[in-house]
Amino acid sequence: MIKEQRKYCYGVYTLMFLLMCIVAFLPFFTEGKSFVWGAGVEDGLSQHFSSLAYYGEALREFFRNLLAGHPKLVMWDMSLGYGADILSTLNYYAIGDPLNLLYGFVSPKNTETMYDFMILLRMYLAGITFIIYARKMKKRSYGTVIGALVYVFSGFCFRLGLRHPFFINPMIYFPLLCLGIEKIYQRERPYVFIFAVCVSAMSNYYFLYMLTIFAVIYAWIRFYKYTEENKMINFCLTILKFGMYYTLGIAMAAVILLPSVIGFLGNGRYGNGVDWKSLIVYPGKYYLLFIENFIGYGNMGSNTNAGYLPIVGIVVLFTLFSQRMKHKKYRAAFIASIIALILPIFGYAFNGFSYANNRWAFALSFIVALLTAEMYPRLFVMSKRQQIGIGAGIIIYTVFCIIVNASGEEILKNKGIMAACGLIAVFYILLLIFQRLGYDTQKRIVRVSMAILLLISVGVHGYYRFDPKGYAYTQEFMDQGQAYRTLKEDNIRMLSKVNDPSVYRVHAEGYRYKNYGLINHLNTISGYYSITAKCVTDTIKGYDTLGMQYADKYKGVDQRLGLLSLAGVKYITVAHNSQVAKDVSSMGDVPYGVEKLRKKGNITLYKNKYALPFAYAYDSYMTEQQYEQLNGIGKEQAMLAQIILNQHPADKEIQHNEQRNGPDIQTISLPETRISSPKGKKYADITVPVEKDKETYLYFKNLVYHGKKNGDDKFILTGRKGTKGILVTQNDVQQKIHIQSTFNPYYFGRKDYIVKINHQTRKAKEKVRLNFLSPGEYEFDDISLITVPKKDVLARLKERKENSMKQIQYEGNHFRGVYHVKKDQILCVTIPYSKGWKATVNGNRTKIYKANGMFMGIIMKKGTQSVKLDYETPGLKIGAWISLVAWIGLGIYGLYFEKYRKKLLNQC
């Protein structure tokens, strides 16, 4: 009987899941869209798709080598931005999640199909694990199935799950953690809990943090269910027991978790604090939209997503009006979750104290689904009080939605909310009819009717959320078959086809997606990874270039020849009609000193004649303290003349320059200190002198946006608004200044910006137009014109090239070359600094300095020096040993546990 019920439960869930997927995602099918989020924001393509395609390829390569008898584990890849550790960078997206091993069976070209399938598979598994948990808690079969469908087909999956596939993982793991906790309390085997902790830790430490918090809360609540005597002693013993199992699970995952955490601790994305005023309360619109979209189809903001099926509205109202003691506990859990969602401080705490964000809302989905599984059978035996209360609640909710939508505020208009209100009313009326007829959940007509209503509900949700006539969410996703082709466009193919055996970097100017290097195996100067080394972030920020939008999102170096050459950028493609802002395209900026190789359509390939090898030497140095006092141009010119070190070198023969020694930089302050964009005028013009033989830049110091002064009512409703930035136009070249306000969750402390002006013009003066993309006031401390003689830049580059390494070889974890030293110097190796690199010179271990902000410096003594650098992921070896011991410990524990258990059974 139990086996038949289990089969029926999983069978009905599977059938309903397939049918609901078809109707919910119908707009994706009719519009020819994939689930790769990349047509609007690039996260889905640049981060997830490219990482998973790369991971699949890496898995196949690893096993090919293993079967061939020469196993090789590549730990570093130069195509990850400027170069980065593979495990610590890609654990956030791919490595560690057991499900992602399936990508090893598909080629990069077919990754999109697997990508779409994996999102649906994760959703399906989330429902399965919920059913396993609910059955353990003795919930009735059909209520459990509906609860699982409510859990899966919610706003969290439809929005965050489609954008970031691994965001669905905690929905799989949390029911397993709760199941494991129940098993431990019931003195059953602890393996479910241990393995759930292990897999959570391997998959993603970010969600492990949240899962740990909610698992502790769950275990604390359930403790009082299982313990009636000696509560204090048992509480301490329970902490000890769970702590032991949790630690064992963490230790089993240490081989992946430890390197990933080390990488996170060296991350440059966070660390600039948060505006405490933003943690007090959300803008007024958030609360209005939260109520509307609890069963609606829109979004609230701060990554808060509810969007539950309409039946949830009835379940919640039923719970609120129920007087049963058991239901009071459910009600308390639900209300506590709602309170946490309406106060930013909880989003801040649950998001690792970085900024207020409610990605933890999957826990609310779990609570709501559990409420549904528990309450559904009781909806057929409602008391008069409950019937009246639920009916009144539906009417009040509907009237509220009508009033809010009729307010005239565009941001509050909710497409389809009346359809949602209508559906909740239909559910309610149907339940009343069934109750009047004496039907319960066992009646076939009840099950069929509810199944049809659920299909209609999710179909309506899919229509309004995804369809172009609704919120048009599908327009943010890429067309089917487009993802791989986009990463192989003409400018990228031209760079890939360059026949040059040397080690170098490339840059695709005007190409929108940052992580194109990963699956094309190109060394680039662009990157967009949530885990980016702090030294890389800080160095690029110090350049004051416009290509850096966020701390972890950077693109090129504004075609500044010095920076390009210092980074070893040898080949460049320029798109002569690229998009820089909405409905705004730009002709490409071609740096001086490059040689045109060929052209295809609007894409031209150039060779940088002044590109330096991956290692070059200096006679003198400057300290980082001196370096940080300079603006972006000063830093660039300083690196052309002397190496920048994080500490004084041991070799006293290396000259320390007290003053910057480089090209002659001229700075002229302009009189403006404030630029406004009053009504009717959205731009300002600045005329600047330019000289053909000089690099010319416009430097904004402490540029901030004060925003548009709204009335108090408007401010309360919308909160503070940031700016879309400033579009800088000179002739046919467009550049964009990305300005972030302190209340922006991605603010990283940037206020200085440098705009490259002299685009090989012959005019004596140039007009620069600043187009303000958002109304308001833009203020800065100083605006300066900076010029640098081109001949001085070229002379310094020539000097660096004359003092460069020969016979350079790079492959995976190894870099080597030969340098002929005429006198003591410091070699700069343009690979990002990491403690995982170890250097030897002529076979002797040598100290590595952090050089030029993010690269590595090695002291070279006079003579011919053979340099070798080898890389090992920090924490990998010790993590592997910890995991090995933990797995052995689990085996020993398992044998002991089974032996002890059998002994107890025999005694009984």
Question: What residue spans do the PLM features occupy?
Answer:
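Periplasmic/ER-lumenal interhelical loops and adjacent helix-loop junctions
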Residues: 42-58, 62-65, 98, 238-239, ...
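Contiguous transmembrane helix-bundle modules in multi-pass membrane proteins
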Residues: 188, 207, 329-345, 349-484, ...
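Membrane-embedded helix bundles of polyisoprenyl
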Residues: 17, 123-136, 142-226, 238-266, ...
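Active-site-proximal, structured, solvent-exposed surfaces of multi-pass membrane proteins
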Residues: 2-6, 657-908
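Extracytoplasmic/lumenal acceptor-recognition loop(s) of multi-pass membrane glycoenzymes
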Residues: 77-84, 88-92, 453-482, 494-567, ...
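Transmembrane alpha-helical segments
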Residues: 126-133, 173-185, 213-221, 314-318, ...
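Membrane-interface coil-to-helix junctions
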Residues: 20-130, 149-171, 264-269, 276-305, ...
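Membrane-interface micro-motifs in multi-pass membrane enzymes
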Residues: 88-93, 113-125, 150-178, 185, ...
